[in-house]
Amino acid sequence: MNKAILHAIIIYTLAGCPYCMKAKALLDKKEVAYEEIEVQNSQDPNVAVLRKKLNNPDRLTFPQIFIDNMHIGGCDDLYDLDKEGRLDKLLEGQPKKD
């Protein structure tokens, strides 16, 4: 089953990544449900999916955030959307975190 169908917000993270923790903290503050996919190495099948979604870049940074299958970008991009007042609009209608 496609995870994007189950969770409209997907965040690809690395364990211990401070930017990943910061992005998740903002999503938690907004009280929206999201799917976190921890990607530990370039052999992980989730990385292949992510590279395909991002047109196969040579270098990936984390986190990578998708809302309704739209690539938002990373932590700074998420916070920029919030500062601009556009994040709440993107999150309208999203399931609330349990």
Swiss-Prot record:
Keyword Disulfide bond assigned: yes
Gene Ontology biological process terms from the UniProt entry: cell redox homeostasis
Glutaredoxin domain location: 1-98
Disulfide bonds: 17-20
NCBIfam families: GRX_bact (TIGR02181)
PANTHER family per the UniProt record, alphabetical: GLUTAREDOXIN-2, MITOCHONDRIAL, PTHR46679
Function: Has a glutathione-disulfide oxidoreductase activity in the presence of NADPH and glutathione reductase. Reduces low molecular weight disulfides and proteins.
Complex and partners: Monomer.
Record protein name field: Glutaredoxin 1
